[in-house]
A protein has these predicted regions:
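Glycine-rich portal/gate segments that line the openings of hydrophobic small-molecule binding cavities
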Residues: 29, 39-96, 148-164
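Amphipathic hydrophobic-ligand
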Residues: 1, 97-104, 143
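Hydrophobic ligand-binding cavity/cleft-lining segments
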Residues: 1-50
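Short, solvent-exposed aromatic-acidic interface loops
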Residues: 92-99, 120-126
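A short, structured loop/turn motif at beta-sheet edges
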Residues: 11-15, 50-51, 80-87, 106-118, ...
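Hydrophobic/aromatic beta-strand elements that line small-molecule binding cavities or substrate pockets
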Residues: 6-8, 74-81, 101-109, 121
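A conserved amphipathic terminal alpha-helix motif
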Residues: 122-164
Length: 164
């Protein structure tokens, strides 16, 4: 199993950072919400409760082309815990390297008035042979992209500094 952790500080209040990652749910229109970003896509299948706990989504995101999936991975994810303006976690199953992942982000108030964001993800390929051959490289690739995505979203709110 692989684990990745990254920390950022952003010049924005905690509630604005939270809202960037957890936008208010629009009134039902009969269609699913879809978020598209550079190289990826998230489709909300079920909204979850008023805070997003229980939300179910499918995600498409880049992976190395040598996995034979055309450079695209897919995951099915459920948000398992939410503490508004503070913490959210999810569990996921993904392919093409069949795997289980968990992830979370936690927001904290920093002494200088900025907001700290810590993102943690674990990744575990089911097949022991594929785990040995590919897990480290695939997770490193996904982790780099996750860091870029988090940093780009935070940069919309204010100046961002990577802390670790």
């Amino acid at each position: 199993m692989r684990r990745h952790e990254v920390r950022f500080a952003v010049d924005a209040p905690r509630h604005r950072v939270w809202r960037a990652f957890h936008p208010r749910v629009p009134p039902p229109t009969g269609s699913r919400r879809v978020f598209e970003y550079d190289g990826g896509r998230i489709e909300i299948i079920r909204e979850g409760d008023e805070h997003g706990e229980g939300l179910v989504r499918t995600c498409e995101f880049p992976v190395p082309r040598w996995l034979g999936s055309g450079g695209v991975a897919r995951s099915w994810e459920v948000v398992t815990e939410v503490r508004p303006d503070e913490f959210a976690s999810y569990e996921a199953v993904g392919k093409p390297l069949w795997s289980r992942a968990t992830g979370s982000h936690e927001l904290t108030d920093l002494p200088d008035g900025r907001t700290g964001l810590t993102f943690v993800e674990t990744y575990d390929a089911f097949n022991p042979v594929l785990r040995t051959l590919f897990e480290a490289r695939v997770h490193a690739f996904i982790s780099r992209r996750n860091e870029q995505t988090y940093e780009a979203l935070l940069a919309r709110l204010g100046r961002v500094e990577r802390l670790s």
